[in-house]
């Protein structure tokens, strides 16, 4: 996982470098935060990639993945530096879209990663195929529960594209291939392990016959694991 995330970060900066066709660039990164190992590893990979490419970067993020207003402020601060480009993992696909438009109007190229925005402005989007990931999670969980029974979803942040797409991919695959599996309504944990654990406990108490639960990100999965 750590190696993959280093490669992921390198591809982000390489993508931006090829997009703006310059060297010695300033390419700030606004992530979703620092609270999960994933983001810590992406930070290290970003810094390593910038060094390798000869570019300057900074890495910031909000206190947690619910702080949309804080992330907006961080993006505004980054744009005020007049960078060559900006890399953004958006907490909310709609709320961050206007800032991407603003960046573009100022000549700042934007690459989104992990979770994008509802805009065609970004020059590239670097991420896993979240719907496919959700579908593959559905196949794996269906195999574990014998393709029948109730299953739940503990997703991370409502409004973020990765949570939406992973959940949609999971639900669509269950409907398509596993008619004997009932998917319970999605519950959101804000990516917080404690909240995810509490949501999981509530789900199990309300559905004592539940067969399995899908956690859509690191924090959600840790919470589910702690609960069961």
Language-model-detected regions and their locations in the chain:
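Bacterial N-terminal signal peptides
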Residues: 8-18
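Positively charged n-region of N-terminal signal peptides that target proteins for export
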Residues: 1-5
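A residue-level marker of the well-folded mature domains of exported/periplasmic proteins
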Residues: 21-228
């Amino acid at each position: 996982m750590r190696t993959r995330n280093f490669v992921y970060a390198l591809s982000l900066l390489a993508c931006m470098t090829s997009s703006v066709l310059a060297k010695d660039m300033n390419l700030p990164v606004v992530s979703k935060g620092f609270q999960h190992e994933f983001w810590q590893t992406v930070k290290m990979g970003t810094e390593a990639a910038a060094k390798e490419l000869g570019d300057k970067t900074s890495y910031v993020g909000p206190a947690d993945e619910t702080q949309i207003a804080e992330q907006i402020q961080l993006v505004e601060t980054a744009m005020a530096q007049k960078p060559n480009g900006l890399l953004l993992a958006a907490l909310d696909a709609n709320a961050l879209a206007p800032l991407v438009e603003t960046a573009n109007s100022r000549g700042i190229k934007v690459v989104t990663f992990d979770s994008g925005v509802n805009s065609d402005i970004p020059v590239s989007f670097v991420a896993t195929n979240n719907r496919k990931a959700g579908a593959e999670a559905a196949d794996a969980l269906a195999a574990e529960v014998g393709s029948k029974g109730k299953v739940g979803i503990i997703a991370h942040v409502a409004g973020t594209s990765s949570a939406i797409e992973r959940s949609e991919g999971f639900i669509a695959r269950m409907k398509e291939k596993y008619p004997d599996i009932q998917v319970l309504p999605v519950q959101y944990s804000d990516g917080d392990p404690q909240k995810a654990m509490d949501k999981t406990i509530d789900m199990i108490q309300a559905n004592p016959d539940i067969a399995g639960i899908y956690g859509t990100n690191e924090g959600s999965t840790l919470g589910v694991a702690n609960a069961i």
